[in-house]
């Protein structure tokens, strides 16, 4: 992470953290940085499962002038999901209360990686990882049972919140097919 500075946001497996200490690379030696992780973050993410040396997905925030190569990802993890099928046809089980925000051909973030949903399921979703994504992220080596951080598309949450004000009980209703509407 060239150019990282004190106070910068950096996503670790999709979880936005703030750099609180750092040292740049010197004479070929690797640089490093540190972040504080709150109890709240540990309780809502899989960061507590990491051991020293575990590979992680690292990403710096996009600047407003940069090209957006996926969807808007905040680094605010909604839940931890569980891998039920490995790449390339990755399947993830998640809290059914969040599946209403997952739609076929929509976006989902898995461990910080913006992905397109192939299949929306009652208890999760599937995505198809292209070889490049599998090679340059940790998703290509994830195994069945591994925990992953999930962030649903924030736009869907905002739309639901805005529409809820116009619904009789302020909540989405169940459609006959069992999907939220």
Language-model regions: role of each:
Residues 1-181:
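Conserved loop->alpha-helix
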């Amino acid at each position: 992470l060239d150019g990282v500075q004190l106070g910068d946001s950096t996503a670790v497996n999709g979880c936005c953290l703030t750099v609180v200490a750092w040292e740049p690379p010197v004479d070929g030696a690797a640089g490093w940085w540190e972040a504080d992780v709150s109890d709240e973050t540990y309780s809502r993410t899989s960061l507590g499962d990491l051991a020293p040396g575990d590979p992680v997905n690292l990403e710096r925030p996009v600047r407003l002038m940069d090209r957006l190569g996926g969807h808007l990802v905040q680094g605010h993890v909604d839940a931890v999901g569980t891998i039920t099928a490995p790449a390339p046809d990755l399947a993830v089980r998640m809290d059914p209360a969040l599946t209403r925000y997952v739609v076929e051909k929509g976006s989902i973030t898995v461990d910080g990686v913006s992905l397109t949903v192939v299949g929306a399921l009652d208890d999760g979703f599937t995505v198809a990882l292209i070889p490049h994504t599998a090679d340059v992220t940790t998703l290509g080596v994830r195994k069945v049972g591994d925990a992953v951080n999930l962030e649903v598309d924030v736009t869907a949450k905002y739309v639901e919140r805005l529409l809820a004000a116009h619904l009789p009980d302020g909540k989405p209703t169940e459609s006959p097919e069992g999907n939220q509407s």
